[in-house]
Amino acid sequence: MATAGGAAGLAALLGGASPHLLIVSASEEPAGGCRPDADLLLFATPQPSRPGPAPRRPALGRPPVKRKLNLETDHQYIAESLPAARGRARIPGRGAKSPGEKSRYETSLNLTTKRFLELLSQSPDGVVDLNWAAEVLKVQKRRIYDITNVLEGIQLITKKSKNNIQWLGSQVAAGASSRQRLLEKELRDLQAAERQLDDLIQTCTVRLRLLTEDPSNQHAAYVTCQDLRSIVDPSEQMVMVIKAPPETQLQVSDPGEAFQVSVRSTQGPIDVFLCPEDSSGVCSPVKSPFKAPAEELSPGSSQQRASPLLHSAQDVNMLLPEALLPGTALPTKCPTEDVSLSPLASMDTLLEHGKDDFPGFLADEFIALSPPQPQDYHFGLEEGEGISELFDCDFGDFTHLDF
């Protein structure tokens, strides 16, 4: 019975439509004995299904091994390819939109806001009906409300009625435009002033270079107190003269805050002088251009009041035609008989006998701001010192007089 049952099961398995590989394991018992049907082990590997009638599943107590043996290749096991994923095939051109459908950018709130502002700018009085705006822009009215709520929150529009709004940005723009025009005018004025200053600086630089490089101007490279008075009036403005070595740094603060002048130099000392107001016979024998002379001097009086110490050859050329008349010899002494014309004369003699005749020459034109020296230099000269020792000046830089 067992053998008949096993044969029947084997026949049922082999009678199927799909091919199977049947493996039968033999028992270790003697050939005379037979095992029951339950001890018979059958292993079958299913093959891929083919179209046709569904085969009958063998009634076995153990499920078939899910393994495929391809005997046509050298390899014993080959992985089975996965079947195609089930589902609807992707229709080509599904993302394409119809010609009448709008894109996402065309329906964006940003573009709608720009178009709404264009409608506001085209309105003569700045009033726009929201219903009319929704029809013109071809958008829903709620999107127009989203725009108006934001614009009203930043105070660019105001509600005139339920569906009418008015633009307020023109008033703000008018105030800003007027201020912008004022700022532009101020900027143009500042640029014109800056160009004028640049031209003046360039002109002064060129003139100063030509003046200093010209050899014929070397003998006149100095400034007198009268030159400064011809520019400004010391009674109204304070004139200060700074004598400093080369590479001196001069810094001037803003006059609007606190006017300060800072002068620094590492090459030598810095001297600052104050140009005083003009007073009769104090600064210089040369008359100030701000005060008319009291009386015209005759040629005879000019001979008497002429300074015995001449500063330049120009003064000599001016005085010689007046002094040397026909039949007149060159005077060798001043009207004061005791005063000598020698440049090596003692300063004491000049102070004692000539101070009445030369009041302007003895007085300093500039007032030194530094404190005076405690020692009296008028009576402290040594035997080897001369008149040049009385002045803090290098007389070697002056041009020699040509008589």
Curated annotation (Swiss-Prot):
Component of the DRTF1/E2F transcription factor complex. Forms heterodimers with DP family members. The E2F1 complex binds specifically hypophosphorylated RB1, the interaction represses E2F1-driven transcription. During the cell cycle, RB1 becomes phosphorylated in mid-to-late G1 phase, detaches from the DRTF1/E2F complex, rendering E2F transcriptionally active. Viral oncoproteins, notably E1A, T-antigen and HPV E7, are capable of sequestering RB1, thus releasing the active complex. The keyword Transcription applies. Residues 87-171 bind DNA. Residues 44-85 are annotated as: Cyclin A/CDK2 binding. Keywords: Activator, Cell cycle, DNA-binding, Nucleus, Transcription, Transcription regulation. It comes from Gallus gallus (Chicken). Residues 130-151 are annotated as: Leucine-zipper. Transcription activator that binds DNA cooperatively with DP proteins through the E2 recognition site, 5'-TTTC[CG]CGC-3' found in the promoter region of a number of genes whose products are involved in cell cycle regulation or in DNA replication. The DRTF1/E2F complex functions in the control of cell-cycle progression from G1 to S phase. E2F1 binds preferentially RB1 in a cell-cycle dependent manner. It can mediate both cell proliferation and TP53/p53-dependent apoptosis. Blocks adipocyte differentiation by binding to specific promoters repressing CEBPA binding to its target gene promoters. It is found in: Nucleus. One of its GO terms (biological process) is positive regulation of transcription by RNA polymerase II. GO terms for cellular component: nucleus; Rb-E2F complex. It comes from the Eukaryota. InterPro entries: E2F, E2F-DP_heterodim, E2F_CC-MB, E2F_WHTH_DNA-bd_dom, WH-like_DNA-bd_sf, WH_DNA-bd_sf. This is Transcription factor E2F1. Residues 45-64 are annotated as: Disordered. Residues 335-403 are annotated as: Transactivation. The gene is E2F1. Residues 375-392 are annotated as: Retinoblastoma protein RB1 binding. Belongs to the E2F/DP family. Pfam families: E2F_CC-MB (PF16421), E2F_TDP (PF02319). Residues 172-261 are annotated as: Dimerization. A motif (DEF box) lies at residues 135-171. GO terms for molecular function: DNA-binding transcription activator activity; DNA-binding transcription factor activity, RNA polymerase II-specific; protein dimerization activity; RNA polymerase II cis-regulatory region sequence-specific DNA binding.
